[in-house]
Amino acid sequence: MSTTESIASSQTSLSSWRKSDTTWTLGLFGTAIGAGVLFFPIRAGFGGLIPILVMLVLAYPIAFYCHRALARLCLSGANPSGNITETVEEHFGKTGGVVITFLYFFAICPLLWIYGVTITNTFMTFWENQLQMPALNRGVVALLLLLLMAFVIWFGKDLMVKVMSYLVWPFIASLVVISLSLIPYWNSAVIDQVNLSDIALTGHDGILVTVWLGISIMVFSFNFSPIVSSFVVSKREEYEAQFGREYTERKCSQIISRASMLMVAVVMFFAFSCLFTLSPQNMADAKAQNIPVLSYLANHFASMSGTKSTFATLLEYGASIIALVAIFKSFFGHYLGTLEGLNGLILRFGYKGDKTRVSSGKLNTLSMVFIMGSTWVVAYANPNILDLIEAMGAPIIASLLCLLPMYAIRKAPSLAKYRGRLDNLFVTAIGLLTILNIVYKLF
């Protein structure tokens, strides 16, 4: 085959779309759509209409460029079957491997704490408002919920993974159905409150600060970084030997782009539908109550006077149940990653990396006790979930998703061709702005 024919074949292949590409597009999309999405409308709608319109413009670039940067880092390793830890070790040595292990663990573990608080608050809200039952002791509720999840994890891990995979699409479908079903309840409150003469760019409630804080929740909600390494390995094994690495990179970018479009469309439609049904004041109230937006919607419809429609009655009960299922799904998914990361840290620093010195059962037990114990402490303390996301969850995700790839592009010879690009500045800015939230929360 001539060079011209080879290039033509490669271009034709890029335009073709395989079943595996669709599978991975939906897989990336499904990974990102979880419990974090239930808090995005609260932060996005907190400042009113103009900030959420700005976030709408930023949503796709944040989702696409940041995940593409991480995918390029994963693609830069010499071994097509090597994961991100191996690739970082290749570029930066064993120290880099330790750093990435820490980053992965501390990027996921705080999410479990967030979900621990969320599931406790969601259950207690459902118990008191929808079931009209007397208030329960918070510590006992958190402990029982965590023990229930620990029991399921310990005795039914394989079943849990299978059930999680089945729950992804019903949850996404429920978000779309709820978004559409809320349309008859839309009102103009958020538009009526727009007064151009009162709009401030700066200040605590200004547009810039609101959007800045909104970037953190976007990084948190539009995040499928945990699966990017596996995705890249799969695509390299499928395409690289036949078409080369450059083609594989373009194919990965194409898949990430389509997954990002799907994700942004579903999440932003859900956020706008919630905002037009409620109001910025309602969103502030939801933040103060420390509950996800579905729980607040359930309480909102429960407090409606007069004869309720069938949908209002269904949503009153269904929204909290959907939220509970979503949080359970997200907790289980992130627990597996946290367990793997903590097991690796204990093995590396407690047993010098010697797997023969400790059984997997003992390792899993030690990790479970720490994970569930720390989650219970945080759930009992009940810190504000959005503050926890903005000060801890999102900054650590940003360091892995945004700053690590940018540092690698600057230092690694195999990534030199990506230097000096405008999208690198954008990804770096998103990472730094997200991390600077820590300073804002402190002062």
Curated annotation (Swiss-Prot):
Cell compartments where the protein resides: Cell inner membrane
Keyword Metal-binding: no
GO MF assignments: L-serine transmembrane transporter activity; symporter activity; threonine efflux transmembrane transporter activity
GO terms under cellular component: plasma membrane
Keywords in alphabetical order: Amino-acid transport, Cell inner membrane, Cell membrane, Membrane, Symport, Transmembrane, Transmembrane helix, Transport
Keyword Cell membrane (UniProt): yes
Main location, first listed in the record: membrane
Xref: Gene3D superfamilies: Amino acid/polyamine transporter I (1.20.1740.10)
Catalytic activity: L-threonine(in) + H(+)(in) = L-threonine(out) + H(+)(out); L-serine(in) + H(+)(in) = L-serine(out) + H(+)(out)
Bilayer topology term: Multi-pass membrane protein
Transmembrane segments: 22-42, 44-64, 97-117, 140-160, 163-183, 207-227, 259-279, 319-339, 366-386, 389-409, 423-443
Matching HAMAP family: Thr_Ser_transp_TdcC
Task of the protein: Involved in the import of threonine and serine into the cell, with the concomitant import of a proton (symport system).
Similarity-based family: Belongs to the amino acid/polyamine transporter 2 family. SdaC/TdcC subfamily.
Protein name (Swiss-Prot/TrEMBL): Threonine/serine transporter TdcC
Taxonomic classification: Bacteria, Pseudomonadati, Pseudomonadota, Gammaproteobacteria, Enterobacterales
